[in-house]
Amino acid sequence: MYIRTALLTAGFLPLGHGLPRPQITYEENTGPVGGVDPPFPTFTAAVGDLRGSTDLQGGIASRPPTSGGDSAIVPDPELVNGQDADADLGLYLDFNSATAPNGPQPIRGGLGGTDPGPRTFEYEKLNPDLYAPPGTDTGDVPNAMWPLGLSHNRHGTGQEAGWARQQNTEVLPAATAMAGVDMRLSPHAYRELHWHTSAEWALVLKGSVRVAAINEDGASFVDDVTAGDVWFFPSGIPHSLQALDEGAEFLLVFDDGNFSEDETFLASEMLLRSPKEVWAKDLETDVSALDNIPQDQKYIFNGTPAPSDIEKQNTTGSAGSLSGPDGYTYHWSQQEFHNTTGGSVKILDPLTFPIAEMFSAALVVLEPGALREVHWHTTSDEWSYFLQGSARITIFKAPESSRTFDFTAGDVGYIPQAQGHYVENTGTEDVIFLEVLQAKKFGDISASQWLALTPRQVVKDTLGFTDDVLDKLPKDKTLIKPGNTNLTALAGGSS
């Protein structure tokens, strides 16, 4: 009776119905848990009481045995390469080789213990450094990672026209200075004419987009951008976006962590929220011209294909058109990478894209085992987005806290101003990620360069390094450090 009542009370067993067949099967714990021993018989009608007897209260009910009762012991726990190593080595633990029910386990260097309880193993495999943290992690650091795959997806109003999902302070509270949106437009679909109070910096991820806007002087702008290109619209600048023949997906970054994609100023709503008489006067037309305006916002909707000749849409007034340093796009895809040992980097900031006066970005490629060197940014928080691969970041927060987070494609990272961090490729393929700063020039302080350029006596007296170590420190910033693709080599593990 107790088990049946517990199931009914917890909502695990629908009244009058059998247990539904699971739609998706995940690798998870099995067997008895929480006083319930599945699988449970099905019923065709409600049976049993919702509440138990007062005889079950403490001091009245019978007590469980101290030995031989329900067991929380995990027999033969499975450890992966590196888990037995010194916890302070902090080796990356690849839990993908661990199999249920004996692994993964939150153990590192003899610390922690087995996990017999409710769990979905996929989370632990994606986040090994949270589940079995390096011994160097300590204190409290706000969450710095949000997977956009967990964000609510807002669909467009047109038939399969597209969608958008966002990250802001509602899901990542630490990200106070920037927010992001991942948007998809099907072929020829529009993001409705709109504007917003935040500035918008965008990177095209897939496909191509035609962008159009005007500035306060009435100068117009239209251009086509493709994967790897960037556009920027200052606060309040009205604009439209239309996917070209192959559709598009793009990443938007805003200079306000509280930005919401659901609170932009839409042209359709603008027409609906003032009297028709006023609009007729303003547009110098008859009131009847407003009979066919949309009765609701259009947001993302299907449209007429854009003409291949962009000049057909290059409408100008007496103020002319915008281009060059006044233009709203930068064809970043055509910029070559700076290549170095371990990876590649290219930078876009106001030195070459002046209209985006407070947005600076780096697109980074890390080879397997490589490291975006330990660094920090002096004047800006860092907003990061991972386009490919898997990586981890440890964030150092003064005076003595640190935490390590794991990232895969589609994840957003956020590191507050001046907090030290690195990015390490933990996978078998290249990691591609974007760093975005609110700064007039992209820059950082390199920890190794700082130590190399500080008087040697000071470094030796402070940190205890030998001359041999200091002799090898580069005096020029390296940005990327190559590394062993076998991340457990220091423990004698195989790759």
Q: PLM features: what roles do these ranges have?
A:
Residues 247-307, 430-485:
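Active-site-adjacent segment of 2-oxoglutarate/Fe(II) JmjC oxygenases
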Residues 1-22:
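Fungal secretory targeting signals
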Residues 19-177, 281-363, 373, 464-495:
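A short, N-terminal "cap"/entry segment at the start of jelly-roll beta-barrel domains
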Residues 193-195, 212-214, 221-222, 243, ...:
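Intrinsically disordered, low-complexity regions enriched in proline, serine, glycine
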Residues 187-190, 195-217, 259, 368-371, ...:
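Glycine- and acidic-residue-biased ligand/ion/polar-headgroup-sensing regions
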